[in-house]
Amino acid sequence: MTTQLNINLVIENAKRVITPLSPISIFAARNPWEGLEADTFEDVAKWLRDVRDVDIFPNKALIESAVARGELDESVFNQLVTDMLLEHHYNIPQHYINLYIDNIKTLKDVPASYMNHSNVDVVADLLLEKSKRDMAESYHHYDVRPMSDAIIDEQGEPLSEQVNRQMIKWTKLYIDQFLSSWTMPKREQSFYHAWLHLAQHDHSFTKAQRQVIKDLPNDPKMTIESVLNHFSIAQEDYQAYVEGHLLALPGWAGMLYYRSQQHHFEQHLLTDYLAIRLVVEQLLVGDEFKSVTKDCESRSENWFKQTVASWCYYSDMPSDVLLQHDVNEIQTFIHFAATMNKNVFKNLWLIAWEMTYESQVKQKIKAGHESLAGALDVNQVNVTENDNANQSHSVSLNDTQAVDENNSELNQVDTSTKAQIAFCIDVRSEPFRRHIEAAGPFETIGIAGFFGLPIQKDAVDEQFKHDSLPVMVPPAYRIKEFADRYDMNVYRQQQQTMSSMFYTFKLMKNNVMPSLLLPELSGPFLSLSTIVNTIMPRKSRASLQKIKQKWLKKPETKLTIDREFDRTSDLPVGFTEQEQIDFALQALKLMDLTEAFAPFVVLAGHASHSHNNPHHASLECGACGGASSGFNAKLLAMICNRPNVRQGLKQAGVYIPETTVFAAAEHHTSTDTLAWVYVPDTLSALALDAYESLNDVMPMISEHANRERLDKLPTIGRVNHPVEEAQRFASDWSEVRPEWGLAKNASFIIGRRQLTKGIDLEGRTFLHNYDWRKDKDGTLLNTIISGPVLVAQWINLQYYASTVAPHFYGSGNKATQTVTSGVGVMQGNASDLMYGLSWQSVMAADRTMYHSPIRLLVVIQAPDYVVARLLANNEHFARKASNHWLRLMSVNEEGRFKSWI
């Protein structure tokens, strides 16, 4: 039992190196380093480079591109270098330091000739003996790597590649439940037991190896310990050894990690995977592991050679000149080279890039207002701050009605604004919001796209239920969509007819004899479809939509807003009346919309439309787990229109005028249109006028927004008809880049709309409304930081990782991807499950960057004490900031910016 508990703990701790990977159909952005954020970004970068040869700093080409485009100010970088040198004193002639810095900052590689020079070997040997003990300790972690990594096979590749191929084969077979007609036998027992059953008959193993498999224990944990003991791995090194195996195929391991979280019967899936992988490694390595020695000394030697060569090359000191110095001087030179290595300068370039962007954001905000303090309405607020942040802070208003919790009806109607439209914080909404506000008396608001509703949706036109909230939060309620019984019966029959046609086609395609006949039967139709879709993508798509609407028209539906008893549901169905009031109140507070309501309030989720795109979910709402957020918008709008909810809100201090009507829509990000999801049958005269006004200007808004967006796509020149061109991109099945998605995302601004209104933030900023004056205890800010900001940071780091290390964290070229097992994509027919973004999602061309890989800048509009209180109360966020996984800046009421590093 003690051993099993130990193995469980080892695996639980080792999971930190991978991230749960959801199926591609419900793709949700994940921070690949979430489990490693207890360490600094720089330490994780060094560790990944050491153990997997993965560099997560922007490379030389990306840095040069940023400088050329004006995104990176070299003077900022030079100042960082100067500051770094002033922190240390080196007893080295200044001209050598200057030469070294001038050369290494270009990030040039050291030529191989320097490494191979005999004098470099002499210097390395000279230093090695004195430092051998220290270096052996430093390089100990290198030796806790999979045995198969250290053994080279006859083809000249590590034996771990053979292990990987075996694991890809078996993992694909286990996971595939949708594409194959036959699934893995005995998979219901467990992955490990199904593999034991089949592997005994797998002739890719020798007869002796198959006998070993047959004799394995039934308990995967016992198998894991047996293999670790066989390889003489010390118990304190178990975790590092297991981490090495998880990082070998982080995509497949991440998919199993995700499934282990979703289903109780698969909770030990990673244990099964590791047991199988370790057995396969043992079988393939055989007795060769005995020849694998702990080569700390050779690694130390190699490190010294690299460092000596770096000093000689960057300082322009020939190795024979270096040898003329005494040992102590040589040690000083090499210590300097080790301290000032190339990755230190890569990190400085990254910081300079981020500081340049931070400065540009400041300038945009300042330039957007003649007086920032005036734009922030500071005359309305008199803030008394005590030096002790723990003491109370009072807020007094010149107009006391502005935040009076017992608001009267008089101050609730905004007669100057026709409509208020609340958009998801998604960066793609920023340009759209800007164009809407420029088109008329419309106000826009930013809030996370799930609108604070922790729900699982059960829509009539979707095969599976979907958790419509951020992936790090489990749903607490289920909301069902339903319609009139007769209409539903007709719709279900139509669905079954369509499903049976597709099922029959799939059945014929996946079976031997019928598949021979299928080309003859389907060839003419599919050929015609191919031609039409290729030549006229927009028209063919529109025609298909018309046919679908005619033959499979979704009936008018309602939602189970009120609590219902459903014994088949594992979640409560619907809300109680008090829960409806609470969620409505919370959402309105998060939108900073508790007074001055316009006659027409639109809650706008967002969705993306593309054709033949396995990654379509990556373009959907990240706050809704990779799905459109119109469902959540409709639900909240319906709740806010209920008289009993409004009465409850009034008792809580929020009065919504009777003339104010809530509606729901979806912002289609691939075409920049606004599609109505829910508009009440009865509108007040003012609401109707606002509704019609918004519809009247929407074509112009779409044209302007599409033109701005299409100008950024690399394959488009001047566009005369931007709306039609955007529709073509969304319909073209050959288009690898229907839209840029969230590429170039760089900042998250939390504050009142006046702070950024009218400012062109280039579609790079998440915008969330917030007024610190109405958040006395910091609860709202903490909610925004813990939810929307966390989602945005995950999105940001996934784009970052897919750009700086596409071979490890990206998903490669879309043109060569293969959808596998119904869960993800591979490159070719046997690779790791590619869990990041495709090359086309972050690059404009093979050598032209589009996404700028910088860490998220979070800007909070609030006094310093509010931010300090947040950092004190939210350790998780404070750790992200202090360990450099994001950058934090604040702006106070006087317009003073402060960086929190």
Curated annotation (Swiss-Prot):
User: Does the keyword field hold Metal-binding?
Assistant: yes
Q: What is its main location?
A: membrane
Q: Which UniProt keywords apply?
A: Cell membrane, Membrane, Metal-binding, Transport, Zinc
Membrane topology, from the record: Peripheral membrane protein
Recorded GO molecular functions are: zinc ion binding
Protein location: Cell membrane
Q: Name one GO cellular component term.
A: plasma membrane
| Binding residue positions for Zn(2+) | 424, 426, 606, 621
Transport is among the record's keywords? yes
Per its UniProt record, the required cofactor names are:
Zn(2+)
Task: Please report which protein family the annotation says this sequence is part of.
Answer: Belongs to the inorganic carbon transporter (TC 9.A.2) DabA family.
Tell me the subunit arrangement: Forms a complex with DabB.
- Give a short account of what the protein does: Part of an energy-coupled inorganic carbon pump.
- Which protein is depicted? Probable inorganic carbon transporter subunit DabA
Q: Which species is the source of this protein?
A: Staphylococcus aureus (strain bovine RF122 / ET3-1)
